[in-house]
C-alpha cells in the first residue's frame, strides 16, 4: 500500500441522531450526524407513520377503498 493516500480512520467516531441517540463506531470522520437511527426508525420501533405528501395518501386510500390507520 502507498503511504499518505489513505484517509485517517477513527475507531471511536461518535454518531449523533436527530432523536438524541448517540453511539460510537469506526469511520473516517470524527463525528457523524444522521437523521434516523435504529432507535427511531419505524422498522425497528414497530410504529408505522404515514406521511401525507400533498394528499397523495388520502387519494390512494380513497382509490382502493381502504381505511386510514393512524
Swiss-Prot record:
PANTHER family: 50S RIBOSOMAL PROTEIN L31, CHLOROPLASTIC, LARGE RIBOSOMAL SUBUNIT PROTEIN BL31C. Binds 1 zinc ion per subunit. Its cofactor is Zn(2+). Zn(2+) binds at residues 17, 19, 37, 40. Part of the 50S ribosomal subunit. SUPFAM superfamilies: L28p-like (SSF143800). Binds the 23S rRNA. GO terms for cellular component: ribonucleoprotein complex; ribosome. GO terms for molecular function: metal ion binding; rRNA binding; structural constituent of ribosome. Belongs to the bacterial ribosomal protein bL31 family. Type A subfamily. This is Large ribosomal subunit protein bL31. The keyword Metal-binding applies. GO terms for biological process: translation. Keywords: Metal-binding, Ribonucleoprotein, Ribosomal protein, RNA-binding, rRNA-binding, Zinc.
Amino acid at each position: 500500500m502507498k503511504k499518505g493516500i489513505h484517509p485517517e480512520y477513527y475507531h471511536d467516531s461518535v454518531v449523533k441522531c436527530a432523536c438524541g441517540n448517540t453511539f460510537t463506531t469506526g469511520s473516517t470522520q470524527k463525528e457523524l450526524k444522521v437523521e434516523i437511527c435504529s432507535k427511531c426508525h419505524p422498522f425497528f420501533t414497530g410504529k408505522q407513520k404515514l406521511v401525507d405528501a400533498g394528499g397523495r395518501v388520502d387519494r390512494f386510500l380513497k382509490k382502493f377503498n381502504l381505511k386510514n390507520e393512524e
